[in-house]
């Protein structure tokens, strides 16, 4: 098979390559006829012959090469030596001596090598004895096998016996050990495995990691229940907490699909709590050609679940766990397109470490409809929505929105003009709450805006390179009369962050409870650098500002305030490639009245080739939301963060990975990640060792160490950190997919 050395050389593959098959080159024979060719052939036809010197025996799809062969034609049996090679439908058997029946494909050989390839998966083995029990059926005695390149035995399965069936694609090993670098690392008395990469029920390789909670071990078992149905059972243990049981079921039908996933810990020794769990259910269903629906349900046992069992990104993104039932409908009606939706949604909101939470309203239900039709240059749009809002500790109510509008599109080669006019009508039916009695209120506002832009092009030369450069000035006028909205509730509305795209929105708010007043003009311009050959965008930069013709402004609480000046702050950006290997980006929100930046972020990434990336990012915000306080309001403060990340080869096939995310204002690291990855020269295995320390709350941190050993076409040992590295390091590449010279 080759050396057990972990650091395979390509020369070893050449020296141990699969034996080549010599064919006669003559016309194919009829079915079940046998051809014998050699330097010397003697014997009696139709009885027995002996062939010596470069023997070639062909029958059906099989070819046998040998130094000599005795062929008994009465029984269709061949004895061959001193060396032989037998080719059978993608498999090659080679060794010293062979006894083989050409008719029923049975026989045996000692000190034999078997090479097979099917559906892109390669297997190689060396055995004391091989028994051929029919077409595609083998039994290997005292054998070693792996899926590596010829000559690479950096890892292999050593077994007392292995039986393989090429037809079913299943192999069964008995008394088997996984040997890595010459050292046995796993043992099983019995195991079955797929030969062709197809799914099959059986034990999966254990996952292993360590960290603040001690050693974490899981022993998953996979159930291939049907071609469209499978399940995984994940029993495991966390040393400082206890036993954890998990599982997943996946199903797929032509009209629907879904995933059910869950974990359960009967008793958490560290928290001194019982029955800690999580449930995830996602179902999508195409009911008819026009009607689809689905369910998304998430639940955990307690507020600390994600902080205890997940990483920093999951903690931040799982504060409001979604529970939603939805139906979508689409059709052509009255010569236009209609889209409708019905939603029922309620969140499980998790409290922060101080026990505070800001729970959104439940939607019980929401019915939305939108009809659009184009007549000439006019696009007619009618939006309608009814929502019933329910909350345990706030005023309930329903909201009905009707927003018909018409937009005209006038386009030509130099630019466009798009005027739009509409009427936004909102009606509320509010229930009684505390000392407040039930009431009905409404708001009707006309909306008018004009969006216009131009595009100029020129050939440009920058640092000796030719580009097609555009200059794209844009004006956006928006008018909405001022109307106090402090008598209206705020069910689901928030303010958009101020950005370049925000300059061209008619409403500063997300949601229908607040509509800003407007009599403003946005003036902006952007430039793009394009590849003159294919038009691909390489770089884009822009800057813009809004000018107010009236100072009235509707605030988030519904009251009418006033802008302090007649123009907004500046916003600008620049993103793109500075060269083939350097990508940079910059975004800024600048207050020219105070001569200060309200926020900005600068990013640069050097990525000359896969597996080589260095990135740096600096982020500043003068008044950013930090955390929820006991009074239900958020605490705002300045943030200054630096984020450094890298993946880089430090020697051939050995890569270092790292990330350092530091909050300068709070004087504490948010995340530290450091590790190393290695892939073998012949590509048969790769390994990762990654350590991570990250923030889980205002005053809490967690540590984790992940080790992963990936064996080609077999499985992963340990806990694969790929997803964590992909999120932590912009431009990260899987080490085992990096091609090195």
Feature-to-residue mapping (PLM):
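N-terminal amphipathic/hydrophobic interface segments
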Residues: 1-142, 156-175, 233
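Outer-membrane beta-barrel proteins and related beta-barrel translocases across Gram-negative bacteria
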Residues: 91-146, 150-161, 165-741
């Amino acid at each position: 098979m080759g050396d057990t050395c972990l650091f395979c050389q390509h020369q070893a593959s050449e020296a141990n390559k699969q034996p080549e098959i010599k064919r006669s080159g003559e016309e194919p024979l009829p079915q079940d006829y046998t051809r014998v060719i050699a330097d010397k052939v003697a014997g009696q036809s139709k009885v027995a012959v002996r062939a010596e010197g470069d023997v070639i025996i062909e029958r059906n799809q099989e070819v046998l090469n040998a130094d000599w062969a005795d062929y008994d034609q009465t029984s269709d049996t061949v004895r061959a030596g001193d060396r032989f090679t037998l080719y059978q439908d993608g498999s090659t058997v080679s060794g010293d001596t062979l006894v083989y029946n050409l008719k029923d494909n049975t026989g045996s050989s000692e000190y034999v090598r078997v090479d097979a390839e099917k559906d892109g998966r390669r297997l190689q083995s060396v055995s004391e004895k091989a028994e051929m029990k029919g077409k595609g059926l083998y039994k290997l005695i005292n054998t070693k096998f792996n899926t590596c390149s010829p000559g690479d035995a950096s890892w292999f399965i050593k077994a007392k016996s292995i039986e393989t069936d090429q037809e079913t694609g299943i192999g069964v090993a008995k008394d088997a050990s996984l040997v890595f670098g010459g050292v046995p690392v796993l043992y099983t008395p019995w195991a079955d495995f797929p030969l062709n990469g197809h799914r099959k029920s059986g034990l999966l390789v254990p996952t292993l990691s360590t960290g603040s909670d001690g050693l974490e071990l899981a022993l998953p078992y996979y159930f291939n229940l049907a071609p469209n149905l499978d399940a995984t059972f994940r029993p495991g243990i966390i040393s400082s907490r206890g036993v954890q049981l998990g599982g997943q079921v996946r199903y797929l039908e032509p009209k629907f699909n879904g995933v059910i996933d869950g974990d359960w810990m009967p008793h958490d020794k560290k928290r001194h709590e019982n029955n800690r769990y999580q449930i995830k259910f996602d179902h999508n269903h195409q009911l008819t050609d026009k009607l689809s629906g689905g369910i998304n349900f998430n639940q955990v046992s307690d507020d600390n679940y994600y902080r205890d069992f997940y990483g920093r990104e999951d903690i931040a993104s799982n504060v409001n766990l979604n529970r939603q039932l939805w139906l979508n409908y689409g059709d052509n009606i009255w010569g236009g397109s209609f889209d409708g939706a019905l939603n029922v949604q309620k969140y499980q909101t998790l409290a922060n470490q101080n026990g505070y939470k800001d729970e959104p309203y439940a939607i019980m239900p929401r019915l939305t409809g939108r009809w659009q039709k184009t007549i000439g240059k006019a696009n007619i749009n009618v939006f309608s929505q009814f929502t019933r809002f329910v909350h345990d500790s706030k005023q309930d109510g329903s909201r009905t929105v009707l927003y018909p509008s018409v937009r005209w599109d006038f386009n030509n080669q130099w630019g466009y003009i798009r005027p739009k006019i509409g009427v936004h009508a909102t009606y509320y039916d509010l229930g009684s709450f505390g000392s407040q009695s039930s009431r009905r209120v409404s708001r009707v506002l006309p909306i008018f805006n004009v969006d216009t832009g131009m595009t100029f092009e020129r050939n440009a030369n920058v640092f000796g390179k030719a580009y097609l450069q555009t200059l794209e000035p844009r004006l956006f006028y928006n008018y909405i009369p001022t109307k106090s909205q402090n008598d209206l509730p705020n069910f689901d509305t928030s303010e958009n962050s101020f950005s370049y795209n925000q300059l061209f929105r008619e409403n500063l708010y997300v949601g229908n409870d607040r509509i800003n007043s407007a009599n403003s003009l946005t003036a902006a311009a952007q430039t793009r650098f394009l590849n003159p050959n294919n038009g691909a965008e390489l770089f884009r930069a822009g800057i813009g500002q809004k000018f107010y013709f009236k100072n009235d402004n509707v605030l988030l609480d519904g009251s009418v305030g006033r802008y302090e000046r007649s123009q907004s702050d500046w916003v600008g950006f620049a993103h793109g490639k500075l060269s083939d290997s350097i990508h940079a980006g910059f975004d800024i929100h600048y207050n020219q009245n105070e001569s200060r930046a309200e926020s900005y972020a600068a990013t640069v990434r050097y990525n000359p080739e896969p597996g080589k990336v260095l990135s740096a990012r600096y982020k500043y915000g003068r008044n950013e939301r930090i955390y929820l306080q006991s009074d239900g309001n958020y605490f705002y403060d300045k943030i200054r963060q630096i984020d450094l990340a890298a993946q880089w080869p430090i020697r051939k096939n050995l890569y270092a990975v790292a990330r350092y995310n530091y909050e300068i204002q709070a004087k504490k690291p948010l995340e530290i990640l450091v590790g190393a990855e290695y892939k073998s020269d012949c590509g048969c295995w790769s390994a990762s060792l990654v350590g991570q320390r990250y923030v889980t709350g205002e005053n809490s941190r967690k540590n984790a160490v992940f080790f992963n050993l990936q064996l080609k076409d077999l499985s992963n040992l340990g806990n694969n950190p790929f997803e964590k590295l992909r999120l932590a390091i912009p431009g990260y590449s899987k080490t085992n997919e990096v091609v090195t010279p």
